[in-house]
């Protein structure tokens, strides 16, 4: 497991329920310290719109669920039950699934806070990307709830006087919502502490001065807190001219990584294929290019089209889920590539096409019209396309097309083209709402079609707007799957798609627009969740135990783990004598064991 941010060190059972119900989805979970048994912990899981609480015992030798498997650390216990679906069950056999960690809110929106990062990972980051005086703050792994200040103290080669890489780690204690380094002044926030020691450097016992010169910033963010990150990125960056914002700084750092993605593009460079490229230097990587299989065997270049498969690379914990959505990023059609375009759509069983450009912009051809007029039928080489109907929405036109092979009527399938018409000739849209509504329609259409192939996305070059739409869609899919408290990383996602097609997301404006679109999506989603919870929970007593008390005590084996239902919120109290902690006590509730 790469993160332990599901641990919430300072919340009660009531607060855990509120978090899971307002910010989580079914399958979301968190862990927290037990209030009734100090030293123990509680696992709180959202299931069927309610919350189950499971007691975790810490014996001093191991962690367990009062029986069953034993683990050396809390993280190993949680990881085990996340990975081994079906091991966590109620008495009646109902499975309790740990799918989506509900991450603890970061204590600061400062970009030098890296959240869950091990000491070794911090040293590697500071050695590879930092210089003398670079620093970051991270969560303590050995003392949950505390933090660590990691500072590079070697020279700019990463070496101290003895020739070794030197990174110093300073424990930051958090007690009674105050922060200190084990003595001296106490601060109200991590930011106040860091700012103090930037001006007043600490000195190690051996005399080394810990100078906090420049932060080593992270790009990871809890999606629910994107508003704070956008606010931070909108501030002036720490540059000499003081006119560049954090967005520029982050995008420039991303641009400097392009040298790591110099994959071969030999097929696009072949003389026979040059006239199939709209721009001579914007070519598909060989390792991800779409290879056309139905060409003339006597014409070796008939397998070429300027297009790449884009596969999102993010972890999923869902069982029995549909295959992850994939994309084809391609250029706008040329007159001599329209036939190949339809061959590709048919071969890949693509049912949705997203067009993000007008045919002509500022007097220049961006994409030839590759579809027939409404109600018309047209043949494109071996492919036949019939335009069944067109309908206009506020920002886009939807075309229902029928695609088949000439002479093979039984191969006909429906293809939906979503033509976004309101992207401005210069820059990006002022309001991301239109793009989000558009992508929502595209998502629902793709989801409604059984076994649909990749979504085809194109603009003119197939990298700028195309990359922007794809990255936004990938990030929103992650949030849909994992909930608003998942971690997202915009630069990392762009780097991932750039590893499959060169140059995806072209400008700082497009980069900023991605953040704005995700922020708008999160704000809208949170408002909807809050309104749903208000209407569902007002005066409603909920429980996740749907069977009688007799059912609870029947059976040959003790459950793994026993769990307690959530009681009415008005009756919140704790009973330390109970083995399984809950935020309330149901009348005459008996132990499951």
Swiss-Prot record:
One of the protein's GO biological processes: heart development
Outcome of mutating residue 506 to P: In LPRD1; does not affect subcellular location; decreases protein tyrosine phosphatase activity against CDC73
Residues recorded as bearing N-acetylthreonine in the entry: 2
Subcellular location per the Swiss-Prot or TrEMBL entry: Cytoplasm; Nucleus
Principal location listed in the UniProt entry: cytoplasm
Disease: LEOPARD syndrome 1: A disorder characterized by lentigines, electrocardiographic conduction abnormalities, ocular hypertelorism, pulmonic stenosis, abnormalities of genitalia, retardation of growth, and sensorineural deafness.
Name of protein: Tyrosine-protein phosphatase non-receptor type 11
């Amino acid at each position: 497991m790469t993160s332990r941010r599901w641990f919430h060190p300072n919340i009660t059972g009531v607060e855990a329920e509120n978090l899971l119900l307002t910010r989580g989805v079914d399958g979301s979970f968190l862990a927290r310290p037990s209030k009734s048994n100090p030293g123990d912990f509680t696992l709180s899981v959202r299931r069927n719109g309610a919350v189950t609480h499971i007691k975790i015992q810490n014996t001093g030798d191991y962690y367990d669920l009062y029986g069953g498997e034993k683990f050396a650390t809390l993280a190993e216990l949680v990881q085990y039950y996340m990975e081994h679906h079906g091991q966590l069950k109620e008495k009646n056999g109902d499975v309790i699934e740990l799918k989506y960690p509900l991450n603890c809110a970061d204590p600061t929106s400062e970009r030098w806070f890296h959240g869950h990062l091990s000491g070794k990972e911090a040293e590697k980051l500071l050695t590879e990307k930092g210089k003398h005086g670079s620093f970051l703050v991270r969560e303590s792994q050995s003392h949950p709830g505390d933090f660590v200040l990691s500072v590079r103290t070697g020279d700019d080669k990463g070496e101290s006087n003895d020739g070794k890489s030197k990174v110093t780690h300073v424990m930051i204690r958090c007690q009674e919502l105050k922060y200190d380094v084990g003595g001296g002044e106490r601060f109200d926030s991590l930011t106040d502490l860091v700012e103090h020691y930037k001006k007043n450097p600490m000195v190690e016992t051996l005399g080394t001065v810990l100078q906090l010169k420049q932060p080593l910033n992270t790009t990871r963010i809890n999606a629910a807190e994107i508003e704070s990150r956008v606010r931070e990125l909108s501030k002036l960056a720490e540059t000499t001219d003081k006119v560049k914002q954090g967005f520029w700084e982050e995008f420039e750092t991303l641009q400097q990584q392009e040298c790591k993605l110099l994959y071969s593009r030999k097929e696009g460079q072949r003389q026979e294929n040059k006239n199939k490229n709209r721009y001579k230097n914007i070519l598909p990587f060989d390792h991800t290019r779409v290879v056309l299989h139905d060409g003339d065997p006597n014409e070796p270049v008939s397998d070429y089209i300027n297009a790449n498969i884009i596969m999102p690379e993010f972890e999923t914990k869902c069982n029995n889920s549909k295959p992850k959505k994939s994309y084809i990023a391609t250029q706008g059609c040329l007159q001599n590539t329209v036939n190949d375009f339809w061959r590709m759509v048919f071969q890949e069983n693509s049912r949705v096409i997203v067009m993000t450009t007008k045919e002509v912009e500022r007097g220049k051809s961006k994409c030839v019209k590759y579809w027939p007029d409404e109600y018309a039928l047209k043949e494109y080489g071996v492919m036949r396309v019939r335009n069944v109907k067109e309908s206009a929405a506020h920002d886009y036109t939807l075309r229902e097309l029928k695609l088949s092979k000439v002479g093979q009527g039984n191969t006909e399938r429906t293809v939906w083209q979503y033509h976004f018409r309101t992207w401005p000739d210069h820059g990006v849209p002022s309001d991301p709402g239109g793009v989000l509504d558009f992508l929502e329609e595209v998502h629902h259409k793709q989801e409604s079609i059984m076994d649909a192939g990749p979504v085809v996305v194109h603009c003119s070059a197939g990298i700028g707007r195309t990359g922007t739409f794809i990255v936004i869609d990938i990030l929103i899919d992650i949030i849909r799957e994992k909930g608003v408290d998942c971690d997202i990383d915009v630069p990392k996602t762009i780097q991932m798609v750039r590893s499959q097609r060169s140059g995806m997301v072209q400008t700082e404006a497009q980069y900023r627009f991605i953040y704005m679109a995700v922020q708008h999506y999160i704000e809208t989603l949170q408002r909807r969740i809050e309104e749903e919870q208000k209407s569902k929970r007002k005066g409603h007593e909920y429980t996740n135990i749907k069977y009688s008390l007799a059912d609870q005590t029947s059976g040959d084996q003790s459950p793994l783990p026993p769990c307690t239902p959530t009681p009415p919120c008005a009756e919140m109290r704790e009973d330390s004598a109970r083995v399984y902690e809950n935020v309330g006590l149901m009348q005459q509730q008996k132990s499951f064991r």
